[in-house]
From Swiss-Prot:
This is Short neurotoxin 1. One of its GO terms (cellular component) is extracellular region. Residues 1-20 are annotated as: Disordered. It comes from Naja melanoleuca. One of its GO terms (molecular function) is ion channel regulator activity. Residues 1-16 have a biased composition (Polar residues). Expressed by the venom gland. Its main location: secreted. PROSITE patterns: SNAKE_TOXIN. It is found in: Secreted. Coiled coil: none annotated. It comes from the Eukaryota. Gene3D superfamilies: CD59 (2.10.60.10). Belongs to the three-finger toxin family. Short-chain subfamily. Type I alpha-neurotoxin sub-subfamily.
Amino acid sequence: MECHNQQSSQPPTTKTCPGETNCYKKQWSDHRGTIIERGCGCPSVKKGVKINCCTTDRCNN
């Protein structure tokens, strides 16, 4: 699996994730504005955090 791993609006970068079957994109807001985090897997998130998990290479941009 290959997933994007750049933060928020940074230029796209990817990471190879051996053994993973998901990529994720988490989104939340704080005093800095909207924060976006991308990576491998499908982590559980706390209330107020939106997450989108997907199962194809580079699907989480």
